[in-house]
Amino acid sequence: MLRSVWVYSLGLAVLLQQSGREQCWEHSQCRDLSSEENILECIQACNSDLTAESPIFPGNGHLQPPSEADRNYAKSHFRSTALGRRTNGSVGSSKQAGENAALSILFAALAPPQAEEEMEESESSQQQRREDKRSYSMEHFRWGKPVGRKRRPVKVYPNGVEEESAEAYPTEMRRDLMSDLDYPLLEEVEEELGGENEVLNLQEKKDGSYKMHHFRWSRPPKDKRYGGFMKSWDERSQKPLLTLFKNVIIKDGHQKKGQ
């Protein structure tokens, strides 16, 4: 009992200090502070006056003063009724509920300035994020303004003027420089391509279709199949067999002479 009264008194003192003047004592609820219910009613009255003095912004419903129905519901909900007095088990819970209500009212009285600052900071941060997002979308896509001037690639001229920039020359002089360049003649290019074409034609005549015989999916020539072991008797060389017969005949002749 004493603990709850001290909690209520502390909350009332904080509210009076926050208000800055003795307007809370003018209420009829604050004249009699002998019971917990009167202290709770006084704290709620002071809290309602403080919230009524704070500016009301759209979208900040928690900063608006509570309605009369909400006040009555809070008073009837947290008040220790006759049912709580009759039941021994609910007495402690009603006291704890009263203390929690006083603490919640105390925190609510202290919260509005901080909540207002947090709301302002959150609104400023959200606005900054929206601006950053908009600037990114405007600069990132084609219809937005580019970040900076695009750098043009450096042009290199083969006639020794690469040290000087191309912007130093007007358009006519640049055309003259390009006309003075020694490009290979078309006849020389055709001759080089003609030599390559002759080599390709010889390869095609030698191995048949170049595309069919050059890649893996084409059949290899007969002389290269299986390493040359699958040749016919006519295609194989007859020299080893003839050399063998010759050696046998010579050996037989030497043996006959020795006999």
Curated annotation (Swiss-Prot):
The modification Pyrrolidone carboxylic acid is found at Q23. SMART domains: ACTH_domain, NPP, Op_neuropeptide. GO terms for biological process: neuropeptide signaling pathway. Specific enzymatic cleavages at paired basic residues yield the different active peptides. The keyword Disulfide bond applies. Keywords: Amidation, Cleavage on pair of basic residues, Disulfide bond, Endorphin, Hormone, Pyrrolidone carboxylic acid, Secreted, Signal. GO terms for molecular function: hormone activity. Coiled coil: none annotated. The modification Valine amide is found at V147. It comes from the Eukaryota. Belongs to the POMC family. This is Pro-opiomelanocortin. It comes from Lepisosteus osseus. The lineage of its organism: Eukaryota, Metazoa, Chordata, Craniata, Vertebrata.
